[in-house]
Amino acid sequence: YRRTAKGRYVCIKTVKSGTTSYVDKTVKSGNRYYYCVKAYNGNVLSGYTEASILYIKAPVVTVRKSAQGVKLSWKKSAGAKKYIVYRKTPTGKYRAVKTVTAKTLSWTDKTAKKGQTYYYIVKAVNNKTYSAASPQKRIKR
């Protein structure tokens, strides 16, 4: 079951016995959703426990070279409280290189070396909820 802040619970999916997870693919960015799960044994419907989730859309990111390094810019993701920038080289793994507040919509990577290729992604965060990663951006400084 799912509801919004002002709505009533509506059954969004019935799953088979033994199913322990479900992905809701109909959520909209910036909305807070409340979920509950009820068990049914054929005769009796159980009580429920409620959980609340704020869905955050992945940021839309652009990258470009600048005199100081590599400049990343992104559009605001509704509900985000901060953004985390991740970087990797062609043979490396993604590592967080910068965390900024929700008011900051750009950052320049001044540690990017000339002649090196880098890949960047950005995630929006609200408390403990992370967005999916932005589409990967590749740039050679």
Q: Each predicted region: which residue ranges?
A:
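Intrinsic disorder/low-complexity segments, especially N-terminal tails and targeting/processing regions
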Residues: 12-17, 39, 63, 72, ...
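Pro/Thr/Ser/Gly-rich low-complexity, intrinsically disordered linker/stalk tracts
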Residues: 29, 41-79, 114, 126-141
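Recognizes extended acidic, P/S/T-rich segments that occur
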Residues: 1-28, 48, 84-113
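A generic structural signal for beta-strand entry/edge sites
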Residues: 19-21, 32, 67-71, 104-106, ...
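Residue-level signal for short segments within beta-strands and strand-turn junctions
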Residues: 1-4, 39-41, 76, 87-90, ...
